[in-house]
Amino acid sequence: MIEFVYPHTHLVAGVDEVGRGPLVGAVVTAAVILDPARPIVGLNDSKKLSEKRRLSLYDEIKEKALSWSLGRAEAHEIDELNILHATMLAMQRAVAGLHIAPEYVLIDGNRCPELPVPSMAVVKGDSRVAEISAASILAKVTRDAEMAALDIVFPQYGFAQHKGYPTAFHLEKLAQYGATAHHRRSFAPVKRALGLVS
């Protein structure tokens, strides 16, 4: 990881999101406070890890972290608020769910939600800050599992493969079968499938 200079505080939470780009399902966030006495080897951006390694780290993070929490904003909230505001809301929910209050929050990306504690956005934080990497892994494994579950209910869309992202296959099936109740109606490809835009 590129060296990151931590704020002078003890209880640092890392926050990341997964699922801003997909056309279906929730945006899922996680907040993690790691335990310095129980280091976790191999934390890295969850997108760069194999699925097997991610699943192994997911269990280890949940076991060793001082506190962890998941947050989410559902498809209907994304449609009501827009994806940016829904993501900020989901991040607030993840931080609020921590059973230990952090002294400082580090958030992946370039903007922070309003929080009751000091926070800082860290560009490429998922590959620079261990707490954000851990949050990224929890959020991704959780959302991927939700897409696999949705795939069982709607096998024709291939959600387990593309995780709801707008792949050519997903767009083809959206045009063929229309949108499910889980699709984000404010996203242009879904609007087109519903005949809401030409």
From Swiss-Prot:
GO cellular component: cytoplasm; ribonuclease H2 complex
Domain RNase H type-2: 10-198
Cofactor binding, per record: Manganese or magnesium. Binds 1 divalent metal ion per monomer in the absence of substrate. May bind a second metal ion after substrate binding.
Keywords for this protein: Cytoplasm, Endonuclease, Hydrolase, Manganese, Metal-binding, Nuclease
InterPro entries in the cross-refs: RNase_HII, RNase_HII/HIII, RNase_HII/HIII_dom, RNaseH-like_sf, RNaseH_sf
GO MF entries: manganese ion binding; RNA binding; RNA-DNA hybrid ribonuclease activity
Residues that bind a divalent metal cation: 16-17, 108
Cellular compartments annotated: Cytoplasm
Gene3D superfamilies registered for this protein in UniProt: Ribonuclease H-like superfamily/Ribonuclease H
Catalysed conversion reaction: Endonucleolytic cleavage to 5'-phosphomonoester
Chief location bin: cytoplasm
Superkingdom: Bacteria
GO biological process, one term: DNA replication, removal of RNA primer
PROSITE patterns: RNASE_H_2
EC number: 3.1.26.4
Pfam family, any one: RNase_HII
Cofactor(s) annotated in UniProt: Mn(2+); Mg(2+)
Cited function: Endonuclease that specifically degrades the RNA of RNA-DNA hybrids.
Family statement drawn from the similarity comment of this UniProt entry: Belongs to the RNase HII family.
Protein name in the entry: Ribonuclease HII
